[in-house]
Regions:
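Long, low-complexity or tandemly repetitive, helically biased scaffold regions used
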Residues: 1, 43-350
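Low-complexity, intrinsically disordered, cysteine-poor segments enriched in small/polar
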Residues: 4-8, 12-15, 19-26, 30-33, ...
Length: 350
């Protein structure tokens, strides 16, 4: 009877705690939507748009048509998709087009995250039930994990494409240029060969998979370190017209609205919960693996456990891609607002 009461009490506490966490996450979501980073960014953009509308009929000052950009000048430099060549954004139309491209990239990676919830949950279930106690269990557990992660890996490989950048290759992974960003940044997906091929059930094969999964990553790097040293210290940027400033603000606002809409959705909370569960399961699995005594583990079971943990960590890194892109959009939007304000200062005041 006492044991039954204790079990009921634990279940009641667990349910209450889950409800508290859910309510807290909804509160954080509300804060993020109305007074968070992107809500404040949207207010700055709307202020820029409002001020641009007041400039109708204003004339540019004599000799002020060209702005000298010395601070944050690299944000006007962009590498080619498959080479180290650099192009400069020097007009308002070019800047507007760049923001539109960034919105498309954000939409792509957000959709990648949006569609991963079931796959992440499936992978978490397989990881939670993994048993690396003996050879047979370890083989089955790794096979289950391999199957569970196949969908995530396929999306990552499909997004990687074929634009290889061998200069950025590492010992265990090839670099694929998936996007270029202003600021002379390049988005690289690091993928080993045969990452989705099921390995043989040997400790050597598991060690190789451990190295491969550790190499899986998404990096935002300088397009070319040597060329970056030669980027112009001062870039001549054509002062934007009031209509271009207004259009820039409108394009920036669309991107922010896309982000706010997603981050305030139920799907975002579900995805976040799935990733959080994966992280907790990963930590428990790794602790269980580390604490397994040498007497209970063979070379294979230990190697398979390490490979499984590396697989889970690689999955976590892949799932962080949208966050990195959204963070970049925030910083670049602030730079664009600065360019808009600098252009306004080139006009005569009434």
């Amino acid at each position: 009877c006492a044991e039954s009461m204790w079990t009921s009490a634990k279940a009641l506490f667990s349910n209450a705690w889950d409800a508290i966490v859910k309510a807290y996450r909804k509160f954080c979501q509300w804060v993020d939507k109305y007074i968070g980073t992107f809500a404040r960014l949207k207010m700055k953009i709307e202020s820029l748009e409002k001020d641009a509308k007041k400039m109708d009929g204003m004339k540019i000052k004599s000799g002020e048509k060209k702005l000298e950009i010395t601070s944050g000048n690299k944000n006007l430099a962009k590498p080619a998709i498959t080479s180290a060549e650099v192009t400069y954004i020097t007009t308002g139309r070019g800047l507007i087009a760049e923001v539109a491209d960034l919105r498309k990239e954000n939409a792509t990676v957000i959709e990648m995250q949006r569609s991963q919830e079931d796959a992440v949950t499936k992978f978490s279930d397989a990881l939670s039930g993994a048993n690396f106690g003996d050879h047979a269990d370890a083989v089955k557990s790794y096979d289950d994990l391999h199957t569970a992660t196949s969908g995530i890996l396929k999306k990552f490989k499909d997004k990687a494409g074929t634009n290889q950048m061998s200069a950025h290759d590492t010992t265990h992974a090839k670099a694929y240029s998936v996007a270029v960003l202003p600021g002379y940044q390049r988005v690289l997906f690091m993928l080993p060969e045969s990452i989705d091929t099921k390995p043989q059930a040997t400790d050597g094969a598991m060690d190789a998979m451990y190295d491969k999964f550790n190499a899986v990553d998404m990096k935002v790097v300088d397009g070319d370190p040597e060329l970056k040293k030669t980027i112009k210290e001062t870039i001549q940027f054509e002062a934007m017209s009031p209509s271009d400033i207004e259009e820039l603000a409108n394009e920036l606002k669309k991107g922010v609205d896309d982000i706010i809409q997603y981050r305030s959705s139920k799907q975002y909370l579900k995805n976040e919960a799935a990733v959080r569960r994966l992280k907790e399961t990963l930590e428990k699995t790794d602790t269980r693996r580390v604490n397994t005594s040498d007497d209970d583990a063979s070379k294979y079971t230990r190697a398979a456990g390490k490979a499984a943990v590396a697989m889970a960590r690689a999955t976590m890194r892949m799932l962080s891609v949208p966050t990195k892109m959204v963070t970049f959009y925030d910083s670049y939007a602030n730079f664009c607002i600065g360019i808009g304000r600098k252009s306004m200062s080139a006009y005569e005041t009434r």
